[in-house]
């Protein structure tokens, strides 16, 4: 393994092969989310991963524009001559989608896990009152925990992580990881209202957990992705953390889509 630092963010590089896969996690995770995935793919690709700025160290919040700029700097360092493959989960999907749409020349294809058209009217309409209340409840709770900060904010965050059955190491979870929710609900650091609707110009493999109280994609968007040449969708019988709950099936599907392995 080798390590580089880009604008204060440490990036780990593991594996071999000309293809570079940049992995972005979400809440309440770190680059450790991808440990098993790196082990499963590093024989065919160079896997690059980072912990999102602010989740453990760095600025308390990173705006959408600054995040896209950082990702551009990272991609230009790790693969200056060829576009990369993005592998995304949770908030990593939101940030990664935006980067891919702003810089389509730097992204060859995308593997996204469990978050699809996050800002679409179709998704909002697909949620009933109970689903909307659930989403509002946990996300605003986490946004408030970030705002409060300190030990109280961290206790609130860990309590929500337990309630949501997050597989992450609870001892590493802090309120610092919640700033995307503050961006979403409080408009912190410019907010997320200017994020573009998710419409990727490159092939997409979208893998999602089928056993959740609500989905983070609309059926309409799923059908649109499935109909695009080169793209595919795959549901697996699990919750939000697909790569943890169903690692063998997830990694087999990814390898099949990326490299045609059966």
Predicted regions span which residues?
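A short loop-to-beta-strand scaffold at the N-terminal edge of the catalytic core in hydrolase folds
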Residues: 5-14
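Conserved HGGG/HGGXW glycine-rich cap/lid loop of the alpha/beta-hydrolase fold
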Residues: 13-57
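Glycine-rich phosphate-binding loop signature in dinucleotide/nucleotide-binding domains
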Residues: 15-16, 75-82, 257, 261
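The conserved beta1-alpha1 loop
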Residues: 22-26, 89, 208-209
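Flexible "cap/lid" subdomain of the alpha/beta-hydrolase fold that forms the substrate-access gate
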Residues: 33, 48, 53-85, 94-234, ...
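Hydrophobic residues on the short alpha-helix immediately C-terminal to a glycine-rich phosphate/catalytic loop
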Residues: 37, 99, 253-257
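Post-His helix in hydrolase/transferase enzymes
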Residues: 244-258
């Amino acid at each position: 393994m080798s390590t580089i630092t880009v604008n204060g963010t440490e990036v780990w590089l593991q594996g071999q092969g000309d293809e570079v896969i940049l992995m972005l996690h979400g809440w309440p995770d770190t680059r450790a989310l991808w440990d098993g995935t790196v082990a499963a793919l590093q024989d065919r690709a160079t896997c690059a991963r980072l912990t999102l700025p602010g989740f453990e160290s760095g600025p308390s919040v990173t705006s959408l524009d600054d995040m896209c700029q950082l990702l551009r700097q990272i991609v230009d360092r790790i693969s200056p001559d060829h576009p990369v493959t993005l592998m995304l989960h949770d908030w990593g999907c939101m940030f990664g989608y935006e980067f891919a749409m702003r810089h389509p020349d730097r992204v060859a294809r995308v593997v996204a896990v469990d978050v699809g058209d996050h800002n679409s009217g179709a998704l909002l309409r697909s949620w009933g009152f109970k689903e909307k209340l659930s989403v509002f409840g946990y996300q605003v709770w986490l946004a408030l925990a970030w705002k409060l900060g300190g030990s109280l904010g961290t206790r609130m965050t860990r309590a929500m992580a337990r309630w949501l059955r997050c597989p992450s190491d609870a001892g590493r979870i802090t309120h610092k990881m919640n700033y995307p929710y503050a961006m979403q609900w409080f408009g912190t650091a410019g907010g997320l209202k200017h994020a573009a609707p998710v419409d990727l110009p490159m092939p997409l493999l979208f893998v999602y957990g089928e056993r959740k109280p609500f989905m983070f994609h609309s059926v309409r968007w799923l059908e649109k992705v499935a109909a695009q040449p080169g793209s595919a969708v795959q549901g697996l019988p699990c919750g939000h953390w697909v790569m943890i709950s169903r690692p063998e099936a997830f990694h087999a599907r990814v390898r099949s889509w990326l490299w045609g392995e059966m």
